[in-house]
Amino acid sequence: MDVLLANPRGFCAGVDRAIEIVKRAIETLGAPIYVRHEVVHNRFVVDDLKQRGAIFVEELDEVPDDATVIFSAHGVSQAVRVEAERRGLKVFDATCPLVTKVHFEVARHCRAGRDVVLIGHAGHPEVEGTMGQWSRERGPGQIYLVEDIEQVATLQVRQPENLAYTTQTTLSVDDTMGIIEALRVRYPAMQGPKHDDICYATQNRQDAVRDLARQCDLVLVVGSPNSSNSNRLSELARRDGVESYLIDNASEIDPAWIVGKQHIGLTAGASAPQVLVDGVLARLRELGANGVSELAGEPESMVFALPKELRLRLVS
């Protein structure tokens, strides 16, 4: 039995930046530092930051006056920003720059008076933040959430001739393209972004897991259950006809999964650290894996800048 590692896998530039912002804020300003929502969707990462002095909250009313708060990588609505400013909270924004790009698109369409269709998953914090970029004060348009092709058939927009779409950044590329095509059939005048809103890291990891699926009879995806991009990776492998499981760490591996398998693929979502992948590799060796190789994959060199106040110190 051998193991084939996907490449790229694990942390993307937006996740790296968000985690580093929390670490450096704690080091520079001292604990506690409040973080609105899990900074990234990974239990191991969140637990580590808690031990360092981060306090995770869901709403700003849980943050004391005069405290420092960090917005998670998923972004926040304009209402949250306004509330933080009204209360005089010190804010570090860890929103992924690629999510911020989507926010700017929605705000631009809103100012132009367009209706906007957001393709995404209801309840996901990124979607809530993006939906929250629309406001009546910014323009007369409306924003609508579409989760799947079936909803396109029943969608009723106010301005079919003045309509644009945007997407959550962590969706399945194939699912999203199908929804966009259905929207274009129904609303031929619909505008779209100049470049795909699904981020480069999501695309690269989805391409890599499909490469794994072609060569393996089992694919394990390291990631937490609430990680959208990690769930999509496991779904894609299963869609390609390969048994696949999403696991938080090595302890969740069921030895029965390995029985009779010759080639095991291993990847990790964009919010899962390499240390968890290493733990899974160690467990697979205990279960009989005797060789590990790595796909070539798509090189990634993207780095996102930290806030100016946090650029001077290094955190291990």
From Swiss-Prot:
One of its GO terms (molecular function) is 4-hydroxy-3-methylbut-2-enyl diphosphate reductase activity. Pfam families: LYTB (PF02401). This is 4-hydroxy-3-methylbut-2-enyl diphosphate reductase. Pathway: Isoprenoid biosynthesis; dimethylallyl diphosphate biosynthesis; dimethylallyl diphosphate from (2E)-4-hydroxy-3-methylbutenyl diphosphate: step 1/1; Isoprenoid biosynthesis; isopentenyl diphosphate biosynthesis via DXP pathway; isopentenyl diphosphate from 1-deoxy-D-xylulose 5-phosphate: step 6/6. InterPro entries: LytB/IspH. Its cofactor is [4Fe-4S] cluster. The keyword RNA-binding does not apply. Binds 1 [4Fe-4S] cluster per subunit. Its EC number is 1.17.7.4. Catalyzes the conversion of 1-hydroxy-2-methyl-2-(E)-butenyl 4-diphosphate (HMBPP) into a mixture of isopentenyl diphosphate (IPP) and dimethylallyl diphosphate (DMAPP). Acts in the terminal step of the DOXP/MEP pathway for isoprenoid precursor biosynthesis. One of its GO terms (biological process) is terpenoid biosynthetic process. The active site is at E126 (proton donor). Keywords: 4Fe-4S, Iron, Iron-sulfur, Isoprene biosynthesis, Metal-binding, Oxidoreductase.
